[in-house]
Amino acid sequence: MIRAPLVKALGALGSPTHQMASRAVRTSAMVAQTPAKAPEKIEVFVDDIPVQVVPGTTVLQAAAQIGVEIPRFCYHERLAVAGNCRMCLVEVEKSPKPVAACAMPVMKGWRIKTNSDLTRKAREGVMEFLLMNHPLDCPICDQGGECDLQDQAMAFGSDRSRFTDINYTGKRAVEDKDIGPLVKTIMTRCIHCTRCVRFASEIAGVDDLGTTGRGNDMQIGTYVEKLFLTELSGNVIDLCPVGALTNKPYSFVARPWEIRKVSSIDVLDAVGSNIVVSTRTNEVLRILPRENEDVNEEWLADKSRFACDGLKRQRLVAPMVRMPNGELQAVEWEGALIAVAKAIKAAGGQIAGISGQLADLEAQVALKDLLNRLGSEVVATEQGFIAGGTDNRANYLLNSTIAGLEEADAVLLVGTNPRYEAPLVNTRLRKAYVHNELQIASIGPKIDLSYDHENLGADAALVKDVCSGAHAFSKVLEGAKKPAIIIGADLLERADGAAIHATVAEYCKKLKKPNWNPFNVLQTNAAQVGALDVGYKAGAQTAVKAQPKVLFLLNADAGKVTREQLPKDCFVVYIGSHGDNGASIADAVLPGAAYTEKQGIYVNTEGRPQQTLPGVSPPGMAREDWKILRALSEVVGKPLPYDNLDELRNRLEDVAPHLTRLGQLEPAGDAGAAGTISKSIGGGAIDIKLKELRDYFMTDAISRASPTMAKCISAVNKQQRENEAKQSVAI
């Protein structure tokens, strides 16, 4: 009876307050006040080409305006100017000696020569000094092929050196530092550009790296022997212009010209960082950041970068059905789909679905459509949210936007730790703290943020105090030009979550400014916003309360549903990529594709839809999630009305048109729960899941399968034990 549709289906599968005050004074002294009127531009000449620039523009920036590239090692657009590599020396007419282009502001009428004999000779001299102590490691260096020193030595260096064996005693050697399981160090290659030091201090907010010694004895290190453990440590690999700091898990794996690169997005948190997936022979080898000023700038969190080895482990590669003896046994797709179809037909419409944190939007729409055709409306997200609050998008979005948080001048964090829940949102807050005199306070447990903040306490009743104007920090928020309140998504799963949400939302209406919405919910789940946008109910308990006879788990691996909560005869179907919590309780396991193996839309915490692109094929018999659901619909006799991705995207456009406009933000209105919330905010302390660095590394099925993430947790635990031992000895 089902043979014909089955063939088609299988085909488809092809005191802090004082610290704040002192910091504000210090920052105000460093940051110049923005003038009310834009300054008049001045004219300078770069290689005899006139350029109009604003006062304060450096020589390097002026040259860049007309496409003239000046070599540099230490300079980076997002870091403070150091001016210590001297590779950017240029000639300025009437100047007695070359000037450092990265650090020298232009003056009116200057004539700058970037390719004169003096400039070329200066660059050759600097390069000769750099190579004097640099080892000839290029054949065995992981940076080979994408090394700034290689490129600039070819373009601007001399063809010979005066430091020969006759006249020179030999190159120096520097001991390598062990700074953790992520960054490999070969410090003999270091050219002392100090990019890593400035990144750690300015962006990551940890002063672990620095310089010791002088002249030829200068070294980059951690002062005392310790690990460089921060949620952003991998970015020093991208910043390092030579092979001194490289990717330790990627060591000796591949050369740049051997790999294929695919632009995609990260889904291991709700930021939606833009990434480049590097692959070879159908294997993901590494992940690098891709620049997007609105989302992640050019940074990438460590979990997003290094957890890619989890894509090769604990994978589901064949459909499985649980046998009478309780064991899962691998079967063909035909057998698995028939087993699920039989359970569906016996359920009589008592079916529910739960979407987890790695589910793409297309699969969520396909699951919802399938259950609707089978007579069920019970589709829910694994993560909870307030009842009645999903009708208004502004209720669950980061309305100030990720980039917009840089402009905030007062922020209240409620039940969230952005440093580990969304590291690249935290970098924006730190940026505002450094450059915008941002004042930050938190309600919840004491947390280690990368900037000074005032902890108001952990009692939930403090939310009411602040929002009623009775607290001292209320005056700070009300006096700010762009205030923001950020609520942790996990906090809203509390019994009084709706009351907290409503109280903050009402207060934010008072704080709202033109073109500025201060109400924010920081999601931690890449699939949450998209699911709520297409009509999913919030919380796994919504599905559990329905007591279904068939339950679909779509990448739901957080362990929020157990067999004990379900009817004894409930048939659980898991669709996902990894053997994790969801697969362990399933009666049928249908192997899906991971985010690097499919084209799928994810909506980040600010409501921006972006898509992943496939870099490799799914392993074994695994298929894209929506194709599995399409095939299953054929088998149960309720075929879904789309056979390819374009048709499915057309269906998505009917459901939520804004979700097909990739990369664009759809403005949301004011937050506020539907109806009146009568419950008051309960007492008790607010808690946070991700309090420490060790909590950050394993939060989903992919990172839990990653050996590198396991090494990170071991390293953090080891260092903490050593620190505790030192403290006990000191006492």
UniProtKB/Swiss-Prot annotation:
Cofactor note: Binds 1 [2Fe-2S] cluster per subunit.
4Fe-4S His(Cys)3-ligated-type domain span: 118-157
Names of required cofactors: [2Fe-2S] cluster; [4Fe-4S] cluster
Stretch forming the transit peptide: 1-27
Disulphide connectivity of cysteines: none
Residue span(s) of domain 2Fe-2S ferredoxin-type: 40-118
Amino-acid positions noted as binding [4Fe-4S] cluster 1 in the UniProt annotation, renumbered to this chain: 134, 138, 141, 147
UniProt catalytic activity: a ubiquinone + NADH + 5 H(+)(in) = a ubiquinol + NAD(+) + 4 H(+)(out)
EC code: 7.1.1.2
Residues binding [4Fe-4S] cluster 2: 190, 193, 196, 240
Residues that bind [2Fe-2S] cluster: 74, 85, 88, 102
Single GO BP term: reactive oxygen species metabolic process
Pfam families reported in the protein's UniProt record: Fer2_4, Fer4_NDSU1, Fer4_Nqo3, Molybdopterin, NADH-G_4Fe-4S_3, NADH_dhqG_C
GO cellular component terms attached to this protein's record: mitochondrial inner membrane; respiratory chain complex I
Superkingdom of source: Eukaryota
Database matches in Gene3D superfamilies: 3.10.20.740, 3.30.200.210, 3.30.70.20, 3.40.50.740
Family, as annotated: Belongs to the complex I 75 kDa subunit family.
Assembly notes: Complex I is composed of about 45 different subunits.
Name of the molecule in the record: NADH-ubiquinone oxidoreductase 75 kDa subunit, mitochondrial
Name of encoding gene: ND-75
